[in-house]
C-alpha cells in the first residue's frame, strides 16, 4: 500500500515539477526559519549537567538593607551571591556531599621567556570540591587534595588551551607555572570543557568561556584579590582588604551537593539556624528567606534564556503555519485540476478514503522534501548566527532538532493538504462522467 501511494505521489509531483518545487520551497522556508530559532532556544535552555542537576543547589541568603529589598521589581528576591564571611561560616557544615564557594579573578601568568610573553588569564578561585561538584573532565592528573585548600598550597589546575600554550599540550603534571609572584605546581589539566550555559557562574554572561586556570580560594588574601565579576553591596566596603572581606559585599557563588531529600532538609535547617544566629548579632535583619535553587531553577531565575529567544521561537512557528496556510490554495488548484481523473476512478469503485489517503500522502511527501530543504537552510541560518553574534557558543543542529524539523514538516504538510484532499475526495463522479 505504501509503495503504491509513494509511486502515485512521485508521479503527481513529476506531472507539474515547477508547481511542486514551489510548494516544497514554501514548506522548506517555513521549516528553515522555525528550526533555526527553535534550535537556538533549545540549546540556550538545555540542561548543562543532566546527570546531577537535581542534586546541585545554588545557595542564596538575604543580607541586604533592612529598609529596602534586593530588587524592588521582584518581591521576595534576594542577593544572587553571598559574602565572604557567610561562605566561610556555612562551609563549616558537614551536611553536603560536596560544597564550595568560588569567584572569578584576573591574574597574570609569567611563562619562561622562550615560551611566551606574560599574559593575562581569567582564574577561578575555588576549593577542591569545585571539581567534584561540576565534574570537569581531566586529561592529565586530577584535583588537588582538600588539605591544599587550608594552607593554601601552591597547586594549580590548567584548562586545555592554557596547557597547550605553556607546555605544547604535553602532560604537565608536576611542572611549575608562575602566577603573579608565586610558583604553582600543576596538579591537573582539563580536557576541553565549556559548559553551556555556564551555570556555575552566569553573572557576566551565561555563554562566556570557562576560566583558564583554577587556584585554591584562599590565595585571595596574600594577593588581596578582588572579584573580576559582579560585586554588590549596600554598605561601605571598608578601607582595606580585611574590612572588605568582613563587609556586606556579595561576590561569591556558593554551591552545595545534596543527594537526598533528608540532606536538603537538614541543610535548609542549618541555614535557617545560621541566619537566626546572625540576626542576634545585628545582621540579616530582613525576613529569613534562604534559597536552595537546583540548576535549572537557578538558570531560570538568572534569565539565562532571554525573552527575545522565546518570542522569536513563537514567531517562527507562526511563520511556519502561515507558510502552510498559504499553500492550501496552490494545492487545492493542483488537486482540482485532476478532478476528471478522480471522477472516473470514483466511478470505477475507488473509495473516498482511498482518494483522501492518496492526496494526504502526497502532501506528506512534499512536507518531507520541504523538511529536508529546511534543515539544509537552517544549517546556513545557524552558521550566520554564529558569525554575526560574537559569543563563546556554537549553535548547531543535534539529533533532537533534526527530528523536530521532520515532525514540523509532517505537520505543515498535513495543515496544507487536509482541506484540498478533503475537497478532491468529495467531488461528485457523475459531473465529470458527463463531461467525459
Place the predicted regions along the sequence by residue:
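Membrane-proximal extracellular/periplasmic loop immediately following the first transmembrane helix
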Residues: 37-111, 117, 248-253
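Short, strongly hydrophobic transmembrane alpha-helices
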Residues: 16-50
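Membrane-helix entry/capping segments
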Residues: 3-4, 11, 15, 275-315, ...
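Mid-to-C-terminal secondary-structure elements
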Residues: 128-143, 154-302
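Short acidic/polar micro-motifs at solvent-exposed secondary-structure junctions
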Residues: 63-80, 101-129, 144-156, 178, ...
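Hydrophobic alpha-helical transmembrane segments
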Residues: 20-21, 312, 376, 399-407
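Transmembrane alpha-helical interface segments in multi-pass membrane proteins
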Residues: 325, 332, 340-386, 403-412, ...
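C-terminal membrane-exit region of the final transmembrane helix in multipass inner-membrane proteins
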Residues: 33, 401-436
Amino acid at each position: 500500500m505504501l509503495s503504491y501511494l509513494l509511486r502515485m505521489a512521485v508521479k503527481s509531483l513529476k506531472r507539474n515539477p515547477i508547481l511542486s518545487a514551489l510548494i516544497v520551497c514554501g514548506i522548506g522556508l517555513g521549516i528553515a526559519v522555525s528550526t533555526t530559532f527553535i534550535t537556538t532556544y533549545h540549546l540556550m535552555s538545555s540542561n548543562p549537567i543532566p546527570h546531577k542537576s537535581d542534586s546541585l543547589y545554588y545557595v542564596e541568603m538575604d543580607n541586604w538593607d533592612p529598609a529596602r529589598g534586593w530588587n524592588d521589581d521582584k518581591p521576595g528576591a534576594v542577593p544572587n551571591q553571598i559574602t565572604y564571611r557567610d561562605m566561610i561560616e556555612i562551609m563549616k557544615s558537614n551536611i553536603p556531599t560536596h560544597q564550595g564557594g568560588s569567584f572569578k579573578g584576573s591574574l597574570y601568568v609569567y611563562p619562561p621567556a622562550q615560551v611566551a610573553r606574560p599574559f593575562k588569564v581569567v582564574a577561578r578561585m575555588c576549593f577542591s570540591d569545585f571539581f567534584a561538584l561540576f565534574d570537569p573532565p581531566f586529561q592529565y592528573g586530577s584535583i588537588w587534595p582538600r588539605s591544599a585548600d587550608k594552607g593554601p598550597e601552591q597547586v594549580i589546575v590548567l584548562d586545555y588551551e592554557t596547557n597547550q600554550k605553556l607546555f605544547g599540550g604535553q602532560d604537565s603534571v608536576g611542572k611549575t607555572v608562575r602566577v603573579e609572584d608565586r610558583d604553582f605546581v600543576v596538579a591537573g589539566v582539563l580536557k576541553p570543557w565549556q559548559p553551556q550555559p555556564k551555570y556555575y557562574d552566569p553573572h557576566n554572561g551565561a555563554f562566556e568561556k570557562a576560566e583558564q586556570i583554577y587556584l585554591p580560594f584562599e590565595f585571595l588574601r596574600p594577593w588581596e584579590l578582588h572579584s573580576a565579576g559582579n560585586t554588590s553591596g549596600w554598605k561601605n566596603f571598608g578601607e582595606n582588604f580585611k574590612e572588605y572581606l568582613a563587609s556586606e559585599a556579595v561576590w561569591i557563588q556558593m554551591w552545595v551537593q545534596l543527594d537526598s531529600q533528608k540532606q536538603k532538609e537538614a541543610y535548609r535547617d542549618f541555614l535557617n539556624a545560621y541566619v537566626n544566629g546572625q540576626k542576634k548579632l545585628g545582621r540579616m535583619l530582613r525576613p529569613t528567606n534562604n534559597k536552595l535553587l537546583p540548576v535549572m531553577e537557578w538558570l531560570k531565575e538568572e534569565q539565562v534564556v532571554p525573552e527575545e529567544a522565546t518570542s522569536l521561537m513563537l514567531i517562527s512557528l507562526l511563520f511556519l503555519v502561515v507558510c502552510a496556510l498559504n499553500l492550501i490554495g496552490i494545492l487545492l488548484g493542483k488537486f482540482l485540476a485532476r478532478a476528471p481523473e478522480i471522477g472516473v476512478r470514483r466511478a470505477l469503485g475507488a473509495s473516498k478514503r482511498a482518494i483522501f489517503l492518496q492526496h494526504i500522502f502526497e502532501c506528506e511527501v512534499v512536507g518531507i522534501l520541504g523538511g529536508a530543504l529546511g534543515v539544509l537552510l537552517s544549517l546556513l541560518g545557524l552558521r550566520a548566527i554564529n558569525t554575526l553574534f560574537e559569543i563563546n557558543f556554537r549553535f548547531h543542529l543535534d539529533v533532537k532538532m533534526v527530528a523536530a524539523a521532520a515532525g514540523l514538516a509532517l505537520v505543515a504538510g498535513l495543515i496544507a493538504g487536509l482541506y484540498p484532499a478533503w475537497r478532491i475526495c468529495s467531488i461528485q463522479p457523475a459531473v465529470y462522467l458527463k463531461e467525459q
